[in-house]
């Protein structure tokens, strides 16, 4: 008789159904079934009466245990046993102690009884739990049921048991089925399990990929047969999802349906009278006009880019799924960095953004004090351009806090005006000059325009002695200042903010000497600015007026094709047209008033006070003031000149744009150079009067502003000391950024880095401002200064495409003339049709490498009169290294601002170490003695493309001295590039280049000759070699040549 099992054996784990046959047979030796199995729990239930115990022998507990009693049965025991102790590896014991609560707690290993110690048998028996089994008892009767569990005594519990008939009768009757029977081991002869698959649970992988690859999905062994879908005729063109706007139901049909089926009547009115005011249409003229006006406004609104952008954004027009949901996109114009390299798509880390973006603006405002970076018209008077050129960043900062997007050029023009009144040597902090003069436009922070303006560089060599840099020097470095930002240039009479169009569009401003007539504009602008700027005082106003007069209409802004035009709300084309008109006006003024306005006398007196430098005799104060040509490399847009005519339009711009002023006391920071006073930067004479070195040019750090030689200006000296009758060509400090974009942010000019050695202090005041400006702009020469440092006359060609030609002065044998070095991407400084710039530099000027397109820097000399030789600034100490290494004098006590350590080439802004200077000997095998072919001068030959101007400054390394420029040029002619011949003398405005020779000795200023034709200067530092085309004989334009007289030491 079957007996209930103890309570501890009450739970049973379910096992997968077996599919193979397993037979538990009683062995003669009482062994357990050969197959081991997972232990299955045994359920003790009251069983109906079963076969008598004596009927047949059954597998008894002893027999089962005889198969081997191993404590660590690797099986899942029923709840009856606590978790078993695993004695051998792989043993798995899963169980819970239910009935056996030993007082010792769970850690105690369970004790197994009987067959539970036979792990192999338990493994198989538990594996077949739930399978159909036939139990044959001793009386020969076979019972069929579903195996449920077994006890430790091997008592089998079977569910749904019924007696199995000898012959199949179809199925058991319901009354014959017993829910559960327990067979005692003594009664069981044989237990047969049919169709058991012991590998069922392990033969398949249950990972998603394995299941997906399995042909039988969800247990289906047969593949599905696809059936053709019969959609009928309705799947034709009836369903045009795109063109069908009815939304499925016609509103009237819906209302009708609802009324018929639900009794709901609608109150819908298609006119929406409760929400709108009906228009009563009539034929009156007024109504038609209003209707037309409304239609026009609707068209304007719908055609506006902002509207279209918003609609496209709402509708996701033209955007891919990636752009909609996963792409990270940044607005290119939202955050512009001053780096030369355009970073439009790139992520700029926050620290770098903070360094670069506000570089100029914040610092500027703080240093200038009066001029907050954001205020549109900060009182600039307090800050004089000369005085303070805040860190390079200030310029980089958007003018007026304006976005950097403004074209740098536009900003620069404002800079041109300097306050003449500012006391000389005025500390940068205290600028008595009206704010306009003080503030140099900030270069836009935009990545397009790294602050090139001298302001950026300004920290470098502005000499305290010239608190106010001449307008030219004050002008931001060639890096263009965005015109869009309106800068009030105090000196310029505070250019009125340009019309929004101008302000928005980056425009090339060509530097044109402006006539006095424009002074009125400046005065007007000053008055306007004074009214607008609460901080301006009467004194400042007076300064501004003086500066305005001097400044004249300094420059016109020509809309440039600068990359930033997209930023401009107004089309650049309009700006260009306006600028052209203004240029014409300015040109007329220039031609009409070459002499310059009387303001010059005032400026001269001021300059004398400030600089203690004799003013040039040029009568026109209004004479072209020095405006550093914007550095084309930065924006790639043409340089911007200050033009009176444009001032009117610029007035708003000036208001909008804060001016940044250069700090005259700032010292150039050249990590690779010994600290030299960069302050020598020549202060180009103010246009009104040649200020010998009214203010040191402030080097502009372009590109990264990290250029080692931040103050690299090619200085254009507007005034040459000439007979008053002659209008001196304007020389504009042309700041070329030597810094590589990567370098930017390395330092803003270190104000104290270089002792401010002012050449003017050491040199006689007689030195013309040109020399000073040239020397200051040039910076230390690459090569040790020779007794005669010669400047390469840089004659800007009238044609931007033409590189200026370098004309050596044959008569000045010992001094090769070196054109200022421009970067390989030469930029053209074209000042309108009138070339009027002299670029002289002993040191290479590096335009930002950033500009991919070579833009020759053409500084056009306005009309210079060949007959008058002007003395170059004597102030400037001879550059330590002069272009010609042959000169016996190696280094002068007063090193040029850009003096490099011997043998060390300055690094180009491009970031390439400028070790690869072309030394005359090294460059070409051509013997120095070889004279350059005259063809260079011939007008016919022209540079196919603007060639970079290379000034080769031989280091002391230069193997041989060249007796004359011809030799040097020949030695340096490395490439086959042909220099463009200077424009014909007959050209409407032959550009004249002033050759500035740094004084040979500490004392005498060298006299420079202005060759009629431009000379392309090749900078040795630039990677791309450019031939120097110098003809010793300037015979073709002898009249225009100014002889060089070597200054005595």
Swiss-Prot record:
Domain of life, per UniProt, equals Eukaryota
Recorded protein name is Ataxin-2-like protein
In this UniProt entry, the residues modified to Phosphotyrosine are 116, 262, 307, 347
User: Which keywords label this protein?
Assistant: Acetylation, Cytoplasm, Isopeptide bond, Membrane, Methylation, Nucleus, Phosphoprotein, Ubl conjugation
Q: Where is this region: Disordered?
A: 1-54, 314-522, 554-573, 578-704, 736-772, 824-852, 868-944, 999-1049
Which residues belong to the signal peptide in this entry?
none
Against SMART domains, the record matches this protein to: LsmAD
